[in-house]
Amino acid sequence: MTDTRIDDDLTVVQTLSPELRPSWSDVTSAGIFRVEPNGRFDKHYHDCDEYWLLFAGRGLVSVGERTYTVGAGDIVCTPTGTEHDIVAVAETLEGFWFEGRTPPGGRFGHLYRTAEDAEGHVVEPLEEGEA
C-alpha cells in the first residue's frame, strides 16, 4: 500500500516513486527491502546514485568489482552506473534504500547489462562465520 500526504512543510510517503516524489525533493525513489537466505535478487545499476542503510542482518554485497561484508548499521553507497548486488546472506538483510535525483533523460528503476542479470538469482545462504 502506498500512501502520500502532502502539506506545506511535511510530506509522508510510505514508498517513494518518481510519480509520488514532491517537486522539491532530490530523491527519485525510496523504500524498505528485505532479502532472506535463498531469496532472490538481481545484479543491476541505476542512472542515479543509490544508498542502502542496513538495519538488520548480515551478508555479502558487491559494488562494482568489489565484494563487502555488511550488516546492521552499514551504509552501502553506489555511484551512478555502477553495478551492485546482494550476493549472499547469513541473516535476513533488511534496510532502507533511496536513489538520488535521476538526471533529465535518465531512466528509472533497475537497469541491466545482460538478460541473465535481469532474471535475477538465488541469494546464497552463508554459514556461521562466513560473513
Predicted feature residues:
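Structural motif
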Residues: 51, 58-60, 67, 83, ...
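Ligand-binding loop in jelly-roll beta-barrel domains
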Residues: 80-107
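Short acidic-glycine-tyrosine-enriched beta hairpin
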Residues: 65-80
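Short, conserved beta-strand element in jelly-roll/cupin
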Residues: 34-36, 45-61
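A short, N-terminal "cap"/entry segment at the start of jelly-roll beta-barrel domains
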Residues: 1-31, 42, 110-131
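Short, charged/polar surface micro-motifs in flexible loops or helix N-caps
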Residues: 27, 36-39, 58-60, 67, ...
